[in-house]
C-alpha cells in the first residue's frame, strides 16, 4: 500500500484506566497490533502517547515505580511499550510521545511554576537517556511555552527554545497544541465546518 499523503505518524493515546490482562495500562494488544499493521502498510509510524501533569515533579521524573497515590511513572509506561513490542515483533510501536501539559489554570509566568517547567525539561532529558534506542521520542507542548525563561543545562531561555534545542538534537517530533479549558464555541465551529 502507498503511504498516506501528508501523514507520516499517528500519536495514539494508549492509556487504559484499569489494568488489562497484559498487566499493563495499555489498550487491548490485539487491537493495537491491528492498528499498527494497518498504519505501517500505509507508511505511517505509530507512537504510543502518554502524559500526566505530575511527571515533571522531582519524585516522578525517571523513577521506575509510581509514588502512591500518583499515577504510573513514565518509565513504567515505556516498559509497557517495550513489553508490547517484544510480544508483537511484527507490529511494533515506532516510538513514544510524552503529552505532558500543565494542569488547568497553570500560570507559567509565576515564579513557583518555573520549577515545573524545569522539571518538564529534565523529564524529557531522562526519558531520552532511558528510552530504548529503537524507539523515537516525540513531545507535545503548549503553544504558550515561550512566556517564561527557565534554567536548563547551564543556560536560561524560554522553555520553548530549550525544547527546540532538544528537538534539533534528539527529538523525533514536537507537537504544539492549543489547549482549551472548555468546549465553548466548539459545537458552533463544527456546525459551520460541516454545513
Spell out what each predicted region is.
Residues 1, 27-35, 77-85, 143-166, ...:
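Alpha-helical scaffolding within the catalytic cores
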Residues 11-16, 78-116:
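Active-site groove signature of glycoside hydrolases
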Residues 45-56, 117-159:
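Aromatic-lined carbohydrate-recognition surfaces of secreted/lumenal glycan-active proteins
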Residues 117, 121, 125, 133-137, ...:
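Glycoside hydrolase catalytic-domain groove-lining segments
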Amino acid at each position: 500500500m502507498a503511504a498516506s499523503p501528508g501523514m507520516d505518524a499517528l500519536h495514539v493515546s494508549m492509556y487504559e484506566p484499569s489494568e488489562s490482562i497484559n498487566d499493563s495500562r495499555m489498550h487491548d494488544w490485539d487491537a493495537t497490533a491491528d492498528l499498527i499493521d494497518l498504519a505501517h502498510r500505509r507508511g505511517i509510524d505509530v507512537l504510543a502517547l502518554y502524559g500526566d501533569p505530575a511527571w515533571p515533579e522531582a519524585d516522578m521524573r525517571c523513577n521506575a515505580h509510581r509514588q502512591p497515590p500518583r499515577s504510573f511513572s513514565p518509565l513504567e509506561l515505556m516498559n509497557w511499550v517495550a513489553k508490547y513490542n517484544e510480544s508483537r515483533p511484527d507490529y511494533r510501536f515506532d516510538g513514544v510521545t510524552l503529552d505532558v501539559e500543565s494542569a488547568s489554570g497553570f500560570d507559567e509566568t509565576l515564579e513557583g511554576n518555573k520549577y515545573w517547567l524545569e522539571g518538564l525539561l529534565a523529564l524529557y532529558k531522562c526519558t531520552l537517556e532511558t528510552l530504548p534506542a529503537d524507539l523515537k521520542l516525540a513531545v507535545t507542548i503548549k503553544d504558550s511555552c515561550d512566556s517564561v525563561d527557565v534554567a536548563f543545562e547551564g543556560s536560561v531561555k524560554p522553555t520553548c527554545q530549550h525544547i527546540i534545542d532538544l528537538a534539533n538534537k534528539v527529538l523525533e517530533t514536537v507537537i504544539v497544541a492549543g489547549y482549551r479549558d472548555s468546549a465553548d464555541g466548539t459545537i458552533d465551529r463544527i456546525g459551520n465546518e460541516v454545513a
